[in-house]
Swiss-Prot record:
Cofactor(s) the protein requires to work: Mg(2+); Zn(2+)
Annotated HAMAP family: RNApol_bact_RpoC
Organism annotation: Dehalococcoides mccartyi (strain ATCC BAA-2266 / KCTC 15142 / 195) (Dehalococcoides ethenogenes (strain 195))
Enzyme class: transferase
This protein's record includes keyword Nucleotidyltransferase: yes
Name the UniProt record assigns to this protein: DNA-directed RNA polymerase subunit beta'
Role, per record: DNA-dependent RNA polymerase catalyzes the transcription of DNA into RNA using the four ribonucleoside triphosphates as substrates.
Protein origin, superkingdom: Bacteria
UniProt xrefs under PANTHER family: DNA-DIRECTED RNA POLYMERASE (PTHR19376), DNA-DIRECTED RNA POLYMERASE SUBUNIT BETA (PTHR19376:SF54)
Cofactor binding note: Binds 1 Mg(2+) ion per subunit.
Binding, Mg(2+): D516, D518, D520
């Protein structure tokens, strides 16, 4: 049995008129849709049953044939074929156009493909298509030559005739004794007239010579020339003229001409010729013909894809396409009629233009001129509108589909659940698992057939719930919380049936879903096939997803009450009951606590299992009981950070199941002891420190001094502002110290903040001390502090100031969410085809990871190299011992050893330098951080990278910092900075960088500030003389280029010389030194660059400083394009990785470098061809780097000249649109432009990425091992079941 999806690639191309007719089941000739009385489709109309198929299954229009037994028969009465009604979704019709019509995608696109091919501007093309100008379509050279000769003959004849007439007149005047002056006047008049006649004739000859195919003529010019030279040229208007011209083009000749032009011209002309050459090559390589861009036949969409629905009250709702088709048919029919009756040319021309406009509106409404509206002011949705945008076919129906077997409900906490479980309401489960329950009822004999089983389920009999309990044990369910920002937003759980209507969620998975219980909703999905169930169990179960794929940190760490409970359990209370008692072992201590003899937090002495005496508490003993034996006794307070570390450690030594058990035990301990702690918070717990009044008064005094100095003009506005800010920041810190010093260490507020359960010292300072300095909406600190605390209450002005900045925070959050979502979408698109497809690409290249100079700006070296593969040996600097061998993984122990050895740079394999031609290899990627092992084959690492960068996007700030006081420079940070880098845009404040190595000189004068960089490098050029040669120069002598340095002493000596057959001549000018037979010329090459520095910029170098190429000369951010052009590919990749990392790390978000590297790789994967050599590549063409290298390797192997190219840095949007897959690009943005290009090039989508496979409904290529096995199983089962009849109504392959 062949599946519909059994193919490997999809090709898109232009459709020829014959192809359109072959798709069609008949011509639509009438604009009618359905008859409003009979409600049946009109014959030959837009819904005709004869063309598109019957409305009712196996029933013709007239009712003569009914039932399936007549399948395939065509009714002799009404002409309808007996078939299923669903053929009306597949069968197309066509309209034979009365005149050719331009396809708006090809005529109006940017650039216009038709215009580029015919060398016409968009404006000229529009004038032709819309019948305002004529274009010459043919010139008869013989007729032209004859016409020119005829004109010359006429000219000379006229001159001769006029001359003889003048001679006669002069003779007559002489006979009449006319004056000499009068006779001369007649001759002068003749001379002027002759010149005028020759000019007029020459003008006509020039006009004739200028007649070239493709020239435009206005209406007046056309009729004037046509009247005189009707046999010399042909010209016409509209799309038929373009059709004729396009059909004349000889692609091979055109190619040769354009290749010559690209080599012989430069600048704008060369660029245009390059574009034209690419287009010509596209037509040559594909089987498309350029005339197919002009339509003579219009396909009609199947009627069920543009339906008409009857509403209440007898009115009809119809798709806009029907109105647009109706306009086309009406105008086409009218044009045919006018042509048949021989209407005047002007009327026919007008009708042709209207037909062109109607077809334009049908294909892409609103692209040209005013858009066609239906029902008042509603813009009609054309065919293009159905494809593009969020509501278009690609994004709405192909990439995002509604899913069967799913439900949705509010979530509540399930503290008693295991980590792998979720609570599923019984009613919901019964609906979701209905087919399975019905199947089991029939199988167990509780119902005779499916129908009665359905009745039993609907009545919810007790035996139904018993079977439901069994059924839910067989398969997990998947829970999803929107927004689905990363893979942990969808996880699988074993369902536990519960009463009520809300889903119950395990408290430890909340952080993965970013869920809380304030009304959040979640969706439930049931995996149906065996493969889906297996994958859900083996990879999606929550116990297999405990680590963040972005950083490798634990994601199932306890929080809030659980953290507080564990902290409370492990803290000590001085003077507690039983303090100082000594016990023989842990069990005895616990026994005494249970009997109430000692307090939970009393400090006691106990012998551990090894016989050592420990000073600890019963609480710590209880906490350590839940930890594995491999973890040493944790004898300390356990705040949130400590719990995270313990979990991270345990993950490496325990299996997923054991880890889940341990986490559940920690959860239970936390909840139990948080409850027994009796934690509460009251106003009295927050006490204002005594020192506050004194500190605030001192700060007011200092502020008053600064204000006074400013008023007297002793300090500037900037200095005043900075002084006030500094004063209050210092005061705030002192008050914070006072609050901390006065804290009750056993108090609930301190314990909450210190444990990491909730709140921090900054919030306590605002409640007890003072709120301090606030920012205004632009992010600038307001130099008026809030001196009150929340405990004391704020004044009206203070309240206003605090809300002023806070409102910006709320607006930021709303904007951040959409901005971050769009960034994630672009990142996903650019990396969706990056999949692990190779074990090892075998490269020896890599990237240097260096210990950051500034701590806190970037992660430390040890964290960055963990999980990477070394690209060469990492050697201990002192002992010379190899810590990590070449091509070995750097695990925790080796990373620690690198840190201890004081190594500051390590050369590692990287996605940036991976040489896998498709996807990526396992060694270059390294460890899968979410699974803590080497990445598996077929893992979609591109998607993981995009999610890891996009998911924390909402946490980034959205502001532009305003540095300094009044006059400062805006520095872009946070999300806008990340976007700026990934889109490879010039930064908002662009730093000036040096293009050369050299010495700096800072110049300040009345013309402003400049930095001059000059380099004076000294080089040597050496000449080795053969024996018997004589030098012609002396040491210390200055020589010019081309001067003779040495010559043979006598004839017949060796002539193996450098540049001349006879003498050795200097290649460069410089100072000579002679040493025996070696002549050396010392010469220097000086280079200089000067940069103008804007007034607001701060200079980073001083006169005399040594400067490297690519070094920043001023503050601001560097343009990545400059780094690429000056320092090359590796430098720009490193810059992008470090700059993005700085933004995230400064906000406390940890992302592994490799995710950013995957994106950077995609941004630099294309090269632009400079010269084509002996390849088929076209100058200016963008080509994949690996394809370019392959083509060059083949050409070199055949002894040809390779192409040359330079690396291009593309922003993620451009990189997404220039992907090899046209399906992925079309579903991203600019759908019509992508499809236009893909059709012309006849592009083949090899379906290597994820998006294209989702679009066509195939399994994505990123399959886990279990899925692959299941795919094979499924194919075998389909083959076996092909002959067997269907048994029940169960979903496919779910048994």
């Amino acid at each position: 049995m062949n599946e519909v999806n059994d193919f490997d690639a999809i090709r898109i191309s232009l459709a020829s008129p014959d192809q359109i007719r072959s798709w069609s089941y008949g011509e639509v000739t009438k604009p009618e849709t359905i008859n409003y009385r009979t409600l049946k489709p009109e014959r030959d109309g837009l819904f005709c049953e004869r063309i598109f198929g019957p409305i009712k299954d196996f029933e013709c229009a007239c009712g003569k044939y009914k039932r399936i037994r007549y399948k395939g028969i065509i009714c002799d009465k009404c002409g309808v074929e007996i078939a299923r009604a669903k053929v009306r979704r597949e069968r197309m019709g066509h309209i034979e156009l009365a005149c050719p019509v331009g396809h708006i995608w090809f005529t109006r696109g940017i650039p216009s493909r038709v215009g580029l091919l015919l060398n016409l501007s968009t404006r000229s093309l529009e004038r032709i298509i819309y019948y305002s100008h004529f274009i010459i379509t043919g010139v008869n050279d013989e007729a032209r030559e004859k016409a020119i000769k005829d004109l010359e003959v006429i000219s000379s004849q006229r001159v001769a005739d006029k001359g003889s007439e003048v001679d006669t007149r002069v003779a007559q005047m002489e006979a009449e004794d006319a004056t000499v002056e009068a006779i001369n006047q007649v001759r002068r008049d003749f001379s002027t007239e002759r010149e005028q006649m020759e000019e007029d004739i020459q003008l006509l000859i020039d006009q004739l010579k200028d007649l070239q195919i493709g020239n435009l003529l206005t209406e007046n010019q056309y009729y004037e020339l046509k009247q005189r030279f009707s046999n010399v040229f042909e010209a016409s208007m509209g799309a038929e003229a373009l059709l004729k011209l396009l059909s004349y083009i000889d692609m091979d000749k055109e190619r040769s001409k354009l290749i010559q032009e690209t080599r012989s011209t430069s600048g704008q002309r060369r660029k245009k010729a390059g574009k034209q050459l690419q287009l010509v090559e596209a037509f040559r390589r594909s089987s498309n013909k350029p005339e197919w861009m002009i339509m003579t036949v219009l396909p009609v969409l199947p009627p069920d894809l543009r339906p008409m629905v009857q509403l209440d009250g007898g009115r009809f709702a119809t798709s806009d396409l029907n109105d647009l088709y109706r306009r086309v048919i009406n105008r086409n029919n009218r044009l045919q009629h006018l042509m048949e009756i021989g209407a005047p040319e002007i009327i026919i021309r007008n009708e042709k233009r209207m037909l062109q406009e109607a077809v334009d509106s049908l294909i892409d409404n609103g692209r040209r001129g005013k858009s066609v509206a239906v029902n008042g002011d509603h813009k009609a949705k054309s065919l293009s509108d159905l494809l593009r945008g969020k509501q278009g076919r690609f994004r709405q129906n192909l990439l995002g589909k509604r899913v069967d077997y799913s439900g949705r409900s509010v979530i509540v906490v399930g503290p008693s659940l295991k980590l792998s479980q979720c609570g599923l309401p019984r009613r919901m489960a019964l609906e979701l698992f209905k087919p399975f329950v019905m199947h089991r009822l029939v199988r167990d004999g509780l119902a005779p057939n499916i129908k009665s089983a359905r009745r039993l389920v609907e009545r919810a009999r007790p035996e139904v719930y018993d079977i439901l309990e069994e059924v839910v044990k067989e398969r997990p369910v998947m829970l999803n919380r929107a927004p689905t920002l990363h893979r942990l937003s969808i996880q699988a759980f074993e369902p536990v049936l519960i009463d009520g209507s809300a889903l119950r969620l395990h408290p430890l998975v909340c952080s993965a879903f970013n869920a809380d219980f304030d009304g959040d909703q979640m969706a439930v999905h049931v995996p149906l096939s065996k493969a889906a169930v297996k994958e859900a169990r083996e990879t999606m179960l929550s116990i297999h997803n405990m680590m963040l794929p972005s950083s490798g940190e634990p994601v199932v760490s306890p929080s809030l009450d659980m953290v507080f409970g564990c902290y409370y359990l492990t803290t000590t209370r001085p003077g507690a009951k039983g303090e100082g008692k000594i016990f023989s072992d842990f069990e005895e201590a616990k026994h005494y606590y249970e009997m109430g003899i000692i307090d939970l937090r009393a400090i006691i002495k106990v012998r551990d299992g090894k016989g050592n005496m420990l000073e600890t508490t019963t609480g710590r003993i209880i906490f350590n009981d839940v930890l594995p034996k491999e973890v040493e006794f944790q004898n300390m307070d356990i705040p949130k950070s400590a719990i995270k570390k313990i979990i991270g450690r345990c993950y490496k030594i325990l299996s997923s199941q054991d880890m889940a058990v341990m986490l559940d035990k920690i959860k239970q301990l936390g909840f139990k002891y948080a409850t027994s702690s009796g934690i509460s918070i009251a106003m009295s717990d927050i006490s204002v420190p005594r020192e506050k009044a004194k500190l605030v008064a001192a700060a007011d005094e200092r502020t008053a001094i600064s204000e006074g100095q400013f008023a007297r003009g002793l300090i500037t506005e900037d200095e005043r502002y900075n002084s006030i800010i500094e004063t209050w920041m210092e005061t705030t810190d002192r008050i914070t110290d006072a609050i901390q010093a006065g804290f009750d260490k056993q108090g609930s507020v301190y314990m909450m903040a210190n444990s990491g359960a909730k709140g921090n010292i900054s919030q306590i300072r605002q409640m007890a001390g003072l709120r301090g300095l606030m920012t205004n909406p632009s992010g600038r600190i307001i130099d008026f502090p809030i001196k009150s605390s929340l405990r004391e209450g704020l004044t009206t002005l203070e309240y206003f100031i605090s809300t002023h900045g806070a409102r910006k925070g709320l607006a930021d959050t709303a904007l951040r969410t959409s901005g971050s979502g769009y960034l994630t979408r672009r990142l996903i698109d650019v990396t969706q085809d990056v999949i692990i497809l190779q074990e090892d690409c075998g490269t020896s290249n890599g990237t240097w990871i260096v210990e950051p100079k500034e701590k806190g700006m970037l992660p430390p070296l040890v964290d960055r190299v963990l999980g990477r593969w070394a690209a060469h040996n990492v050697v201990h600097p002192q002992t010379g011992e190899i810590i990590v061998g070449n091509n070995e993984e750097i695990d925790e122990a080796k990373a620690k050893a690198i840190g201890e050895a004081g190594i500051t740079e390590v050369f590692v394999r990287s996605p940036l330098t991976c040489e896998a031609t498709h996807g990526m290899c396992r060694r270059c990627y390294g460890r899968d951080l979410g699974r803590v092992r080497l990445v598996d084959m077929n893992t979609a690492v591109g998607i993981i990278a995009a999610q890891s960068i996009g998911e924390p996007g909402t946490q980034l700030t959205l502001r532009t910092f305003h540095t300094g006081g009044v006059v400062g420079v805006d520095i872009t940070t946070g999300l806008p900075r990340v976007e700026e880098l990934f889109e490879a845009r010039p930064p908002k404040v662009q730093s000036i960088i040096s293009e050369i190595d050299g010495e700096a000189e800072v110049i300040e004068n009345e013309n402003g500030r400049h930095i001059r960089i000059f380099s004076d490098e000294v080089y040597q050029d050496e000449y080795e003389l053969p024996s018997g040669w004589k030098t012609q120069v002396q040491s210390g002598q200055w020589v010019d280029s081309g001067m003779v340095l040495a010559s043979p002493e006598m004839e017949g000596k060796s002539k193996a010389v450098v540049q001349s057959d006879q003498n050795v001549v200097a290649r460069v000018a410089g100072e000579v030194s002679v040493d025996g037979s070696l002549i050396t010329i010392k010469y220097s090459e000086s280079e200089e660059r000067e940069y103008a520095i804007p007034a607001a910029m701060q200079i980073k170098v001083k006169t005399g400083d040594s400067v490297r190429a690519g070094q920043q000369l001023t503050d601001g951010s560097i343009n990545p394009q400059d780094i690429l052009s000056i320092l090359g590919r590796d430098a720009v990749q490193k810059y992008l990785v470090e700059e993005v990392q700085k933004v995230y790390y400064s906000q406390g978000v940890h992302i592994n470098d490799k995710h950013i590297e995957v994106i950077a790789r995609q941004m630099l994967i294309k090269v632009r061809i400079d010269s084509s050599g002996d390849t088929d590549l076209v100058p200016g063409e963008l080509v994949d780097k690996f394809r370019y290298e392959d083509i060059n390797a083949k050409v070199l192997a055949e002894g040809g000249e390779p192409a040359t190219a330079h690396t291009v840095l593309m922003g993620i949007t451009r990189a997404s649109l220039s992907t090899e897959s046209w399906l992925a690009a079309a579903s991203f943005q600019e759908t019509t432009r992508v499809l236009t290009d893909a059709a012309i090039y006849g592009k083949v989508d090899k379906l290597s990425g994820l998006k294209e496979n989702v679009i066509i409904g195939k399994l994505i290529p990123a399959q886990c091992k279990s899925c692959k096995e299941a795919t094979v199983e499924r194919a075998e089962r389909i083959a076996a079941a092909a002959a067997a009849p269907a048994v029940s109504t169960l979903p496919e392959n779910c048994l």
